[in-house]
């Protein structure tokens, strides 16, 4: 059985960038193993935030590989993401990893997947994981209708809170990082 399930949400808003993730780790489809996992982390001298959804062991492998790429390309987020995606897609061992990453710095927000995709959203919002669609919808509504009164970190936190009320694989122990 694998450990997985989570929700990660990221937003760029009013010159700031924030990412939030819940703390639930689920064994299979029915057992919560941990409530306080930290799936959002700062990398590269605290200039980059990365969050993962999927298999925990696979995600840690990808974090290490991504951080190595960031160091290799001196913090160039886009180049590091593209290089990781290429390696992930072409390496027979990495190709079996079951996880997705959202990575961001102050200027750029990207989704990185094992199929070789590196996607930058049109609206500055991304969400992945079991509650990703709920968080995405909530985040878009918050940004669109309350954006003038909320900071990026507040949009991220509230989007995750709403997702946790709907998705059984997402809890309300939320970690938020902001740039």
From Swiss-Prot:
The active site is at residue 6. Pfam families: Proteasome (PF00227). InterPro entries: ATP-dep_Prtase_HsIV_su, Ntn_hydrolases_N, Proteasome_sua/b, Proteasome_suB-type. PROSITE patterns: PROTEASOME_BETA_2. Its EC number is 3.4.25.2. Allosterically activated by HslU binding. It catalyses: ATP-dependent cleavage of peptide bonds with broad specificity. Na(+) binds at residues 164, 167, 170. GO terms for cellular component: HslUV protease complex; proteasome core complex. One of its GO terms (molecular function) is threonine-type endopeptidase activity. It is an enzyme of class 3 (hydrolase). It is found in: Cytoplasm. Keywords: Allosteric enzyme, Cytoplasm, Hydrolase, Metal-binding, Protease, Sodium, Threonine protease. Belongs to the peptidase T1B family. HslV subfamily. Protease subunit of a proteasome-like degradation complex believed to be a general protein degrading machinery. This is ATP-dependent protease subunit HslV.
